[in-house]
Amino acid sequence: MTTNAINVKKTPPVLSGGLPYLGYALELQRNPIALLQRGQEQFGEIFSFLLAGSNVTFLTGSKANEAFFRAPDDQFSQKEAYQFTVPIFGKGIAYDTTPDRMSEQLGFVFPALREERMQAYAGFMATEAKAYFETWGEYGVVDLLAAMNELTVFIASRCLIGREFRQHLTTEFSRLYHDLEGGINLLAFFQPYLPLPSFRRRDKARVRMVELISQIIANRRAEGNEGEDFLQALMTARYADGTALSEDNITGLLLTLLFAGQHTSAVLAAWTVILLLQHPQYLPGIMAEQQAVFGPRETFSLEGLRQLVALERSIKETERLRPPLIMLMRKILRDFEYNGYQVRAGGLAMVSPAVSHRLPDCFHFPNRYDPDRFTPDRAEDRKSPYTLIGFGGGRHRCIGQAFAYQQVKVIWTVLLRQFELELVHQNYEPDYI
């Protein structure tokens, strides 16, 4: 008698506990990083857990990150994972269209981030930052994250939507943008169309946003004005089949770029300030560098901003310790294997920059604030292309990274010229709710 061995591949270890059906949904909403770090400490670079009826496979570490980011789209899909963005960006935009159509749309977006546009943005950013900080008076107390959220909305709208929109920007736009952001939460990830108050506000805000942008488009066409901004580029853009973009499509692409450039910038700017003030020994070098590059000049060139290498290292260390994107997900469309484990299709794959960046295999003394880890002689972020992933990685890396870094550099340069800063409290922790 002969027998054939059955090759049964092991599945990732499971984080036990959680509530029936909900699993770890509530804990993930309250403090996702604590939950994911607990699983990593228990199981290492791969484990799974239940999340609202779905099986989530969590991957962490540079090698696991590489497997996540290099997986083909027909295996790990962004489209199915990010359907919660459809009510905000709109039907037929980004994650609600075919890969070919999305590539065309990204082709419309990329010119807004080219070098000649970034040079113009440097001037817009400085003008907005100076005007904003002048409203602070000579002394006082500010909510830094709220201030950075407001300022980066002003900057992003001026750079990306245009002068007319920024000149007429009122508290209405801030409210609309806030209502759109309020539609992004854990529940929206699974059920983005439930009749909830936050989702109703989100939907009303988008309708009003289309109205505002449509009015600007109508005025430009009626008056024969042609701006030199991203809005104008979208107004004249055509798909490969010759189809022009509808006003709803234009609004959706503007919102896509606005979200990419604003949220990440606000978080990065606020935490850069906090971490530097918590570690003031790095401030003299940054201020000396700014004086050497710009002196008393009121204008900031793109080339000059690139010379602020000490400041850039501090921003990069902020990206590492307080990444603007704390979790990234994909829908698993085909079975995949990693490190001897087999993961079945149908669930979700997840990585977390906030967890991965704190691993000693990725960074030396990972919990220590140390911007010098990014000097050329150390270059800890270059151990692997997937060691520093605060803006994602691979072909789907966040397109707003260069915009965010430039914006933070300008904000910091203006801020340090006008104010001496100190923290009201020394200890600050992220609020994930």
Regions found by a protein language model. Give the residues of each.
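Cytochrome P450 heme-binding "Cys pocket" and the immediately downstream C-terminal segment
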Residues: 280-282, 403-433
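Cytochrome P450 catalytic-domain helical core, especially the substrate-recognition surface
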Residues: 9-37, 41, 55, 62-63, ...
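Conserved cytochrome P450 K-helix/beta-meander segment immediately N-terminal to the heme-binding cysteine loop
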Residues: 351-379
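A generic structural signal for short hydrophobic patches within well-formed alpha-helices
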Residues: 64-65, 356
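Central I-helix of cytochrome P450 enzymes
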Residues: 152, 156, 206-216, 237-292, ...
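Proline-centered turn/helix-capping motifs that create local helix->coil transitions or kinks
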Residues: 164-165, 182-186, 217-228, 243, ...
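Cytochrome P450 catalytic domain signature, combining two hallmark sequence patches
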Residues: 34, 66-85, 363
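Cytochrome P450 I-helix active-site segment
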Residues: 11-21, 122, 126, 175-176, ...
